[in-house]
């Protein structure tokens, strides 16, 4: 598998580089350090099977354009995309295979599936999501917490996302609360609490190191390479 890596000098890029090694045939990084091209123009045309993006969500337009130009698969590992950027991803998937996930962890994909199954099994249960991350994380709730909510909403279309809790007012039956904690150097913890009255269920995933995201990104690249045009995600990889 021949890969081009966007965001090669970033933390995730370096991890992926260490896994794929000789399979990397091209690199791009906005900082230009270590002689790495800063743009697609500086890189030039390089034949590859997959373009893996772990740079920044604002780069997605250039990543997709380059992947289409060389007729390669695109794996988008960045988060925080605007509605316009998500529309670009959707449009590109009509022409090339695109793998896009808000979290590249296979364990999180399993958690989302289990949360969906639990919500279906206990249609009247109260459900709350709790996410914990390090103090340097700038967004809340996490994109992964939104992913979990979206998975639950597939079987509870009436569900309403409620971020945080303050002031007066009872919890409504439709809401699914999301609580965010920022503590020390926590890589990432996500919990789903289901209260069915006579019984309670807690689903929990903890990221021990960020290696899981790099490993998931590589697995995603191998999974989607050679697939027909379309939009793929971690649930597709689970089968």
Provide a role label for each language-model segment.
Residues 2, 6-45, 123-239:
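C-terminal substrate-binding/catalytic lobe of Rossmann-fold NAD(P)-dependent oxidoreductases
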Residues 55-56, 79, 180-182:
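Short glycine-/small-residue-rich Rossmann-like dinucleotide-binding loops
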Residues 4, 73-75, 99:
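Structural detector of well-ordered beta-strand residues that form the stable sheet scaffold
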Residues 63-65, 77-99, 109, 113-117:
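Rossmann-fold NAD(P)-binding glycine/threonine-rich loop
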Residues 22, 72, 96:
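Short glycine/serine/threonine/alanine-rich loop segments
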């Amino acid at each position: 598998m021949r890969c081009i890596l966007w965001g090669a000098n970033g933390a995730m890029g370096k991890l992926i580089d260490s896994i794929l090694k000789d399979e990397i045939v091209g690199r791009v990084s906005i900082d230009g350090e270590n002689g790495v091209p800063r743009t697609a123009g500086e890189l030039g045309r390089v034949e590859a099977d997959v373009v893996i993006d772990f740079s920044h969500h604002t780069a997605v337009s250039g990543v997709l354009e380059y992947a289409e130009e060389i007729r390669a698969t695109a794996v988008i590992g960045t988060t925080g995309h605007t509605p316009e950027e998500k529309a670009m991803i959707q449009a590109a998937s009509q022409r090339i295979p695109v793998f896009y996930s808000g979290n590249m962890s296979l364990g999180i994909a399993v958690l989302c599936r289990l949360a969906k199954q639990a919500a279906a099994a206990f249609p009247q249960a109260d459900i709350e999501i709790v996410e914990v991350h390090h103090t340097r994380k700038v967004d809340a709730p996490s994109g992964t917490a939104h992913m979990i909510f979206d998975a639950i909403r597939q079987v509870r279309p009436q569900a309403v996302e409620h971020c945080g809790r303050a002031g007066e007012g009872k919890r409504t039956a439709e809401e699914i609360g999301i609580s965010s904690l920022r503590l020390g150097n926590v890589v990432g913890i996500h919990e789903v609490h289901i209260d069915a009255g006579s019984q309670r269920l807690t689903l929990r995933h903890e990221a021990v190191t960020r290696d899981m995201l790099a490993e998931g990104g590589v697995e995603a690249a191998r999974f989607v390479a050679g697939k027909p045009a379309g939009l793929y995600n971690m649930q597709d990889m689970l089968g």
